[in-house]
Amino acid sequence: MAKNVLDLLMWHPKWDIERCRISYLHRGACRNLKTIRGSDIERLERGFMILRDGSSIPYHRVVKIVCDNSFIWKKQKKGIG
């Protein structure tokens, strides 16, 4: 789950969330996808993250997390059957 990965990136001394990019579904954006920097995140709440500009993004919209050009997490597509 994206929340667990973001918590780890935010609080574990090995990781630096400011070196990460988070892509999420955003209707109206190019390809309905928008990417923010980890430094744009002010805090993590139970069901969503709060950005420094005051907006919020639900975790279920996060599709991938990349740090230092390496995939850290990617949302799994739901299969049929």
Swiss-Prot record:
Pfam families: MJ1316. It comes from the Archaea. Belongs to the UPF0248 family. This is UPF0248 protein MTH_1281. It comes from Methanothermobacter thermautotrophicus (strain ATCC 29096 / DSM 1053 / JCM 10044 / NBRC 100330 / Delta H) (Methanobacterium thermoautotrophicum).
